[in-house]
Amino acid sequence: MKTKLIVVLGPTAVGKTALGIKLAQQFHGEIISGDSQQVYRKLDIGTAKATAAEQAAVPHHLIDVREVDENYSAFDFVQEATKEIANICARGYLPIIVGGTGLYLQSLLEGYHLGGQVDHEAVLAYRRELETLSDTELSQLVETKQIVMTEPNRRRLMRSLELHKFSQGVQNQGSPYDVLLIGLNDNRQDLYERINARVDKMMAAGLLDEAKWLYDNYPHAQATRGIGYKELFPYFAGDIGLEEAVEKIKQNTRRFAKRQLTWFKNRMAVSFYSVSDSDYKGKINQAVVDFLRN
């Protein structure tokens, strides 16, 4: 019998965290973060982590598991999430993954890896081929393959392309999970207003100080590439004003939300629920009940 697993996904700021907590409380679950930035300690505001009170109400996993100057990849996520799922189930709880990092979620659910079944010489040859491309050419290649990334750098672009190319033929013998995918969405205007309001709320909560600490101590760390931090660095350097930097955060977040939706719709068989529907929570609740009953 396959392990039952619920995944709550969707664009940033749509309300995934609140729904995940509600489902965990109602269905005896624990939450695993499926967000590539929430793994970093001390970066709480810009990564929109669940609050201390929320984490106290429901156990959360894969949050605060890396120092800011450490790297984290889809491979790390698959390995660690797999262990957390097994541990949660062993304790008699329902694992619920909540997040919007499409590459991480797809890698876990479809069993992607670059392990022993892969021809490593072929991987190295492809890597050498990628190394001949400019950053612009790598970005264009990633875009054509509809790989969603936040603030990509050259190393992450190449790594994602390797995963995309070589994972196609090395899926496990079917996913080990019986998965219910729950997608949240909203009409574009309302979603963009949510995003803008959330950025304003983050600024009021102290995002500027959090970003300044990162700028002063770890200006070149992988963590700095998350939306909400990098946009403020030119302000700290005296190159742009604060208002312009904040607007850039909003703009980049809106663009990222659009890319997230494209990824989920094209690559994952997910049922979407509009948060503008007054009964969307009731519909999701019934879907979970039916899923757990079967």
Swiss-Prot record:
Q: Name one Pfam family in it.
A: IPPT
> Any idea which positions bind ATP?
G10, P11, T12, A13, V14, G15, K16, T17
Q: Where is this region: Interaction with substrate tRNA?
A: 35-38
EC annotation from Swiss-Prot or TrEMBL: 2.5.1.75
Cofactor needs: Mg(2+)
Q: Where is this site: Interaction with substrate tRNA?
A: T101, R127
Keywords associated with the record: ATP-binding, Magnesium, Nucleotide-binding, Transferase, tRNA processing
Residues that bind substrate, according to the entry? T12, A13, V14, G15, K16, T17
Which EC class is the enzyme in? Answer: transferase
Q: Which GO terms describe its biological process?
A: tRNA modification
Reactions this protein catalyses: adenosine(37) in tRNA + dimethylallyl diphosphate = N(6)-dimethylallyladenosine(37) in tRNA + diphosphate
One GO molecular-function entry: ATP binding
Q: InterPro entries of this UniProt entry?
A: Dimethylallyltransferase, IPT, P-loop_NTPase
Query: What does the UniProt record say this protein does?
Result: Catalyzes the transfer of a dimethylallyl group onto the adenine at position 37 in tRNAs that read codons beginning with uridine, leading to the formation of N6-(dimethylallyl)adenosine (i(6)A).
Query: What does the subunit section of this Swiss-Prot or TrEMBL entry state?
Result: Monomer.
Tell me the protein family, please: Belongs to the IPP transferase family.
Which protein, by its recorded name, is this?
tRNA dimethylallyltransferase
Q: Which gene encodes it?
A: miaA
